[in-house]
Structure formats: structure tokens, C-alpha cells
Amino acid sequence: MYDINKVRADFPILSRTVYDRPLVYLDNGATTQKPLCVLDAMREEYLNANANVHRGVHYLSQRATDLHEAARETVRQFINAPKTEEIIFTRGTTESINLVAASFCEAFMAEGDEVIVSVMEHHSNIVPWQLQAAKRGIALKVIPMDDSGKLDMQVYEQLFSEKTKIVSVAHVSNTLGTVNPVKEIVRIAHEHGVPVLVDGAQSTPHFAVDVQSIDCDFFAFSGHKIYGPTGIGVLYGKEEWLDRMPPYQGGGEMIESVSFEKTTFEKLPFKFEAGTPDYVATHGLATALNYVSALGMDNIAAHERELTDYCMARLAEIDGMRLFGTTEGKDAVVSFLVGDIHHLDMGTLLDRLGIAVRTGHHCAQPVMDRFGIQGTVRASFGLYNTKEEVDALVAGVKRVSQMF
């Protein structure tokens, strides 16, 4: 286990106050804070190695290119992908899923074909498929879940038909914290000859991910949720699929040759990386991945699950408490309501106590519909959170509850 005080010292923002109270930051599911090493690495590149990548023979361009491609290799190692060519840089998980939805559907799907998703998906893993459904006449099938937030795997198996072309599911629910059995989901899909995209936005920051062990065909995650910069994300895809998928966008760098008669495209991964990439952000992402790797993903997972269990137990002591997402082994997310108190009121008053949580539907309205509610209060943990901060949350919830 790591020294939590030393870790917190790496994040300057955690020492600030809000409304003259110590900041208790429990909104890591939305975005994480950044360690000094990430901020310093990005500043250093802008100061001393800022130039466009893949486009210049001069020193600065070569240096920036080396850092950018080294970041790709860092990502490959972090998720244990077989090849660097299978690592595509995007703007985030949302763009990664949109890329797959648009390109895969163009290559492999026709009117009447089907996509399987789950009821607990983030809107970013629903809307891209709906856009394709409206354009191409394909259909979405939905895996239901029980009252604890666990997917119904029996129904999942029954959803497959000869029209099923892809499955796209969250590794971890951003609202419930449910850790889905993605290896089993992939195994079943592959028995039907169907590829699987895994949304790893809420898993990659919290425990070790091995895409070869999962055997998923696509995997997406975001930099800003794993202590890296905003605006950078990753799509891993098996070469056998990516090679057969058309480019998602057109522009510079993704071409091999251009004439007014015909354009030919670059090989992987550049075929899917049109335009100037955010090469400073890729360096920042790599620095963040090295930071969490040094702490140990198993250590981070153990720390955060201890916090999650502790928070669930403490909140359950409060009269009128309703906890959403109660599956065993859930990860780093606690969603709740208290009595008839509106989630926005609870979140607003907690904020006045210096406690940052998220309120609302968390970009997962079908989850709210499943439980017959409009929204929840969500506390989500990161590697720097403490039991004392959980205690502050519990005390804050009790104090707010007494106002109603």
C-alpha cells in the first residue's frame, strides 16, 4: 500500500479550501485531479519541445514525435495490448465509441442488423449507436439488470440472433459502480462470432486492465479520468477489425497519397488519426499512466474498494438512506438519495460544506428510469481520497438531512 499523505502532496489542488472549508473532492467519476508530474511534463514540452509531430525533419518536431509515439507505447503496455499499431489516440472515450460506431457500422452493418448494449450504459455508449440506427435502420437490444445493479446474463445470451453484429458494454457503471463480467460477456459474444467493445472509462483508473485477458475487440478510455489531461483518449482495437474499417475522419496525416481522382490511406494507427494530434496531452497521459503504475494498480484498487465499502456502510446508518448499486465487489462509486430530499438540494448544500459530489442522472438516464427516479447524489473515489473524507461526507449528509 502507498503512503496516502505523500500521494495527496502530489496534487496541489487538494490543499485548497472552498467556502473557507477544506476541499473534499468526491467527483472523480466526472474527472480526476492532476499530479504535479503531469502538469510539469506538459509545461516542459510546451517550453522546450513544442512542434508539430510527424511533419518536420527539424529537432523540435523529431523530439515531439518521439514523445508522442513513446506515449503510444506506454498506453500499449498499460493495457497489455499486443501492438502499438492497435492504439489510436482520440479526444476521449466518447470519440472512441463514436469512431467504432460510425466506422464499424459502415463496414459491417446493414438495415435490420442489431447492436447489443446494456441498460446501465453512459449516454456515450447509447447515442452513437442510435445515430447509426437512424441512419442505417439498425436496432438496439438492451441487457436488463436486477435491483442490485447486476446485469441479467441469462437474458443477455438470449438476445443474440443472426442479425447481431456487435456488443458494446461498460466495464464499470459510472452510476452504480457495478463491475460487469466483461470476460464472460466477450466469451459468449465470440461464441456467436460477434465482436465486443468495452467502455473502460470507469475501470481503467481503478484497477489493472488487460485487454488480451479480456479478449475484447475494442476498448476505450479517457485520459482525464486517470489523472491525465482533458481532451485525450484511447481506442484499442484488434488489428483484424481496424484494418477492415474505413477512416472515421479525413484530413492530414491519415493519408498515403492524395489526388483529385483518388486518395489512399495510411496504415494503422494513422488511418484513424486525421489532423494534428494533441501531442502534449499524449505526453501528459503517458506521465499519468506511469504515475499510477508506480503506485501499483492493485494497491489503488484495494484502497478504493476499502473506501467504497466503508462509505456504503456509513451511509447505510442514516435514516431514509437509499443506496443504488449494491452488487458485491462494486467499484469506487456510491449513488444515493435521502428521504424526499432532492439530489440537487443535497449536492448544493454539501458544496457549501466544501464537499464536491455530482448530482443528477450522470449521463445515464436509462439507469434512473430503471429505478424510477430522476437522479442521485454520487460520490466517486480516487486514489487520493481518505476515510476522513468519507466521514466528512457522512457528517455533511446528516447535517443536510436535518434541514428538511
Show where each model-derived region lies.
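Pyridoxal 5′-phosphate
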Residues: 1-404
